[in-house]
Each structure stands twice: as C-alpha cells, then as structure tokens.
C-alpha cells in the first residue's frame, strides 16, 4: 500500500532541517490577487486550523503567531514571532522566525512561490521548514490533516469568481 501523501508532500529529514514539507495547490485568481492575500500572515488563520491567533507586531511585516496542536487529550501551544524577510511581487514570499530576545530558538520558515498557469489561475507551492526537536509522528499526522483541509479552504477562498474573498 502506498503512502497517502504524494512524494512532494512527505516530511523529509534533511541535514540542518528537522522537518520540511512541500505543499502544492492550484488556485483561481491572478498572481497579484493571490500574492496580496498570502503576503499577510493574519490571513493564514482563515484556512490553517493549527493557527490559533495572529497579531501584528509593530507593522505590516511581522506577526506574533500562536500555533496550537491537539493530539488526543493533549494540546500544545507555541508562540512565534514571524517576519516577512523576502518578497518578490507577485512571485514569492518568505517568512522566517525572528525573535527579539537573546535566546537561541529553533528555525521556522515558510517559503511561498506563485506560478501563473496557462489559461486561468496559479500553482502555489508552500515549503514549511522546522529545525526544532519537538516534532513527532503524532504531530506530523495532525499537521498533515490540517494541510489537506487548508488546501480546500484556500481553493474556496480563491474560487472561480476571479479572486480572493479576503481583504
């Protein structure tokens, strides 16, 4: 029996990166419309169930993101200060964890690439990377289920009406 995830979506253990997942989804809308929505992390909680809260942190390029994972009766919360560290309108965006304290923190990274397809819509690729030691098989299963739901919600957000329903 084959793995339920396609090869590109399987978690990979790489040197220097504990977890890396590639998520691909096709969306209706122009690259500019999709980019405008995906460049703001506050919008991500509309489709990603493991994002509990997102608050801006002194501007439009940094956010305090609270992640929440529940495995059975156990829940874990994790707060991250995420910063948009790179953007190339309308092709790509990269967010990275950038805490302001002097402590050493695990890396979190989200790289979004938007490619216009011939005809209508775009292909969007999101690469999520985490270098911390607290990842586990149960968390992987929770994350994967949220990703599958997020794909559907994203497609609904960018339905064939020509653009995002998020402002």
What is the meaning of each model-derived region?
Residues 56-99, 153, 157-161:
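Glycine-rich portal/gate segments that line the openings of hydrophobic small-molecule binding cavities
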Residues 34-38, 44, 63, 84, ...:
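Hydrophobic pocket/interface hotspot
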Residues 96-152:
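Beta-strand/loop substructures that line and gate deep hydrophobic ligand-binding cavities in soluble
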Residues 20-22, 77-81, 104-111:
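Short, surface-exposed coil-to-beta transition loops
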Residues 2-62:
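Hydrophobic ligand-binding cavity/cleft-lining segments
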Residues 147-157, 164-167:
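Compositionally biased, intrinsically disordered linkers/stalks adjacent to structured regions
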Residues 30, 59, 89, 117-120:
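Short strand-connecting beta-turns/loops that link adjacent beta-strands
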Residues 53-55, 83, 109-113:
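Short, surface-exposed charged micro-motifs
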